[in-house]
Amino acid sequence: MKQWGLKPEEIDASVTARVPIYISNDSRYFQDKYQAIPIKGYTKLIENILNHKNITVQLNTDYKTLSQNEIKEFKAIFYTGAIDEYFDYQYGELPYRSLKFDIMTIDKEYYQKSVVTNYPNDYDFTIITEHKYFLDEKSNKTIISVEYPQAFSLGENERYYPINNEKNDKLYNKYLRESKRLENVYFFSRLGDYKYYNMDLAVERVFELLKKLENSIFTNK
C-alpha cells in the first residue's frame, strides 16, 4: 500500500479499517451525524486561542532548553511532540510516514466534485484536496494540494502518520512506561500518543485528559 510503504498484512487492522468503502451517492468520507469545522477555519481558531492574555508564545524554542527548575515551576506540562524524541531516542526511533505537498492554483472554478478525492491506484500521489469546499468560498480560480507519501527521515521531513503494528507499538510502550515516571509532564497528540487521530478524536483526547486531571492540578488547593 503506497501510503504506508508496507504490505497490507504488515499494517495493523485498526489502520486499514479507517478507509471505508461505501456504495452511495454520499461523497463524504465520514458518516457522523454531525460534521463541522470552525466557521473561519482552523487557522483563525488557533489564532484566537493564542491571542488569550494568559498565553505566551515562544517560537524557535526547544523544550530541552528549559532548565529543570523552570519545568518544576509548572503544575503541568503538556507535550505534543514526538515521545521518542523527548527521551532522546533511548530505545530507538519510532517509525513514521511523511508527506510531500504540491500546492497549485488552477485557473477554473472547481477542479473536482468533492473536497477530497483519494487515488489508491498507480499514481504517485494518494490524495487531492480542493480547499475552497471547506468554507464554501466563491472564486473563479481554485487551489488544490496534492499529497505524495514518503518515508520519514529524521531531520529531513516531518512526521505525519505513526506506523502502528505489533513491533512498533511494543517500542512505543517502552517510552510510555518512561513517561509514567514523570510527575508533571503529560503526552498526547499523534506524536505523543503514537496514535493515528482524526481531528475529532484529537479534541476528544484533550477533554478526556483535562477531565482526568481537573481535580489534581486545576484547582487552587
Where on the chain are the PLM-derived regions?
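A broad, structural surface signal
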Residues: 44-47, 51, 88, 204, ...
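Aromatic-acidic/polar surface patches that form glycan- and anion
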Residues: 35-42, 118, 195-202
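C-terminal catalytic lobe of FAD-dependent flavoproteins
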Residues: 158-221
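Hydrophobic, Leu/Ile/Phe/Ala-enriched alpha-helical segments that form helix-helix packing faces
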Residues: 49, 53, 135-138, 179, ...
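Gly/Ser/Thr-rich helix-start
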Residues: 6, 82, 193
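Active-site/ligand-binding neighborhood in enzyme catalytic cores
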Residues: 1-76, 87
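Mid-domain catalytic core of redox enzymes
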Residues: 61-178
